[in-house]
Amino acid sequence: VLQRWATKELTNLLDHKLPPNIHLQYQGLDLSLFSGSLKLQNVALEIHNKDTASVSTKLNLDQLDLKGLSYWQILINKNIKLGTIKLISPKVIYQPSLKAASKDSVAGSKSEKKFPAKLNSISLDHLVISDGQFTMMKKTGDSIGLSLSNLNITLDDIKSNKEIIQNKIPLKYANGTMSAENFYADISPLLDVRIGSLNLKNKTLDLKEVALKTKYSKEELSKVITSQRAYLDLKIPELSIKDFDYGFHGERFFTTITEISVNNADLLVYRDRRPPDDMRYKPLYGTLLQHLPIDLTIAKTNVVNSKIAIELLMAKASES
């Protein structure tokens, strides 16, 4: 009887009592009070922007498994304690909002974050995401800004409470691993980055088949630019980032790296000298590094067995 009542109440909650900007569909729900487990199958979730009603996030999920919910911790200690959450084959599409943040919302982001009033803490032994896909669209919504596939993530000993949630990173975890393939990022109107595979484990990030390349061919670039711009084609078969760490010093984000190793890099720089120079002020790289919006520390960089080629297309004497 209790099992049927709990299943009915949970179904009613998911079907009718979620916030109006959250739309959830699923085909199968399996709840076990005895083992503290929940399984949802063929999940489709949409989160809409409250101000525009447009869809900001879509999630399709083959299966969600939750195991090891401790009722004793909830009832006696007011803690939510979970064993394992597994997300199987999640596919996420995120659409950033075109609307700029208002002054009120920016100011509100610095206000105290609210933890569930009747709870002391939330903890999770293991979070497992397997065979995921993530796509972030550009703000205009007409093209992809970032994407990756075969995403696998594990996090252990995750926790949050009234104090931790006030931090810039509102949770803590002990160990984590991450791997993915087919990474793509549109980083500027002329450049994109592609990475064949990436793997993060024990604070070491290994990248394979890294490519930074101009979106146009040499000939096409010459047709679209109005002043001189370099054509870039950088290939790095293997790149390793060791002792990678990150966090916040107060309000400022930091990243520290003990060593970056680059093997067999091949860089081609091509410049068509026929268009006019861009005479606008352009700060040197040293100045740009001094004014980064984050604190970046790289102790050592190794570049091995690599080459750089520079090609110039000069204007003919009759054209000058």
Which residues make up each language-model segment?
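N-terminal type II signal-anchor transmembrane helix
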Residues: 1-19, 141
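Short coil-to-helix leader/linker segments, especially the first N-terminal amphipathic alpha-helix
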Residues: 20-21, 281-283
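Flexible, surface-exposed loop regions and adjacent strand-edge segments
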Residues: 99-107, 275-281
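Short, intrinsically disordered, charge-balanced linker/junction segments flanking boundaries
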Residues: 316-320
